[in-house]
Amino acid sequence: MAKQTINQGTAPTGAGGDTFRTGSAKLQANDNELYTHLGAEADGVLTVEKTRTKLGVISDKSELTILIKDSLRQSVELASGGLQTVLYTAKGQATYMNIIQKYDMSTIDASLSGTHPAFIVDGVEKPEIFIGTYQGRIVGGELLSLPNVEPTHSTNYTNFLTAARACGNGHHLITNAEWSAVALQCFKDNKQPMGNTYYGRSSENPLLIGRRADGLNPGDTSGSARTLTGSGPVEWRHNGKENGIADLSGNVWEWNSGMRIFNGEIQVIADNNASKLAIDLGAASTEWKAINGETGNLVTPDGSGTTAGTIKYADGGTADYTINGSNFGGIRNLSTTKPVTAAALARLKALCLYPHIENTASYNGDYFAKTMTDERLPIRGGSWYNAAAAGVFALYLSNARSSTPASIGARPAFVNL
């Protein structure tokens, strides 16, 4: 086999070049060819004898053993058909990830256009993002995506954010943009997942169960009914298959980064910039931007949640550029004089802050609620007791960043920065 060369594209962005996965496949093919030629065993171990060898190595009385393959990563990628992989943190710990490829919003809704914002960081498009296959568990100060563990809970947003960033550059707490990118794909594929929404089982189908961390039986309403990550059936995966992302619906709510409301005003971090290691996501950060209800452009907020002309949630009424609803699919444009324009709604739809189809039933009654005072951060997905209100589009905007409920966890993600 001839040596495979990676197409690096056009500098400085790499436009037109190979994706991360394609480039990795070429490197792996080159490695496989080389080590086969050198006589590597099937397990990928190359033993160099005591004399000068084809590698040009002269060893002493011992043998030189070179471990050439990451068997865990290879096994995960092989079993998942390349949709999952294993990344390693700053401390060398494994974290399991699903690879989500870049897509255009027109593939979700023909009336929308442009690359989904989850795939844009500092104005540069990314070919893929990596989403934790499992809800996160903090181990050694790092937020990891691991199978068959109880997800960490009862921890505030800041602690989860710190643990996610401790994994190294590119590792982060899942952003609202990333969550939305996955949720919209679920919708497009007609695969809105079920999950642990009734004390260890699905509220929609009691035969779909997971293994409760407290050891009690599914459906027993006593105890804290968190299930072990990924222990449910394929119906609890985002694509309905074993290689999907687990537990996006139910089990524990998940903190999302990069979005908030402040006194009801919707504010976001541009695109997927919330994935950056050093970006300021604090309450007083100047990175927070409001959304102009006429143009959809990001604008600097006034600091009190009353910025003129920006989109705000409301508890009712018909004030300019306000939206509200009793569940996610029921959120509607309220104003009769200055409704949010189509251009501005397009931004909200991409971020799953407004239904991209105004049809309540299309979103299975997924939950929506908010608190209209002070800063409130989003949690998504629902918990083990939310029943039919839990789901991939469920959005709850009532928690302060200091909140520590037992029903809230988090999920790690990664972008190659």
Language model: regions and residue ranges:
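Extracellular adhesion/carbohydrate-recognition regions
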Residues: 74-171, 264-322, 376, 409
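C-terminal, surface-exposed recognition/capping segments
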Residues: 180, 205-208, 213-215, 221-225, ...
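Short secondary-structure boundary/capping segments
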Residues: 187-192, 260, 269-272
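Structured alpha-helical subdomains that flank or immediately precede key functional sites
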Residues: 62-79
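Short, polar loop/linker segments at the starts of domains and inter-domain junctions
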Residues: 16-24, 140-155, 391-398
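Fibrous stalk/shaft segments of extracellular and virion attachment machinery
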Residues: 1-63
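Acidic glycine-/aspartate-rich tracts in secreted/extracellular proteins
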Residues: 11, 32-33, 61, 135-138, ...
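Short aromatic-cysteine micro-motif
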Residues: 114-247, 279, 341
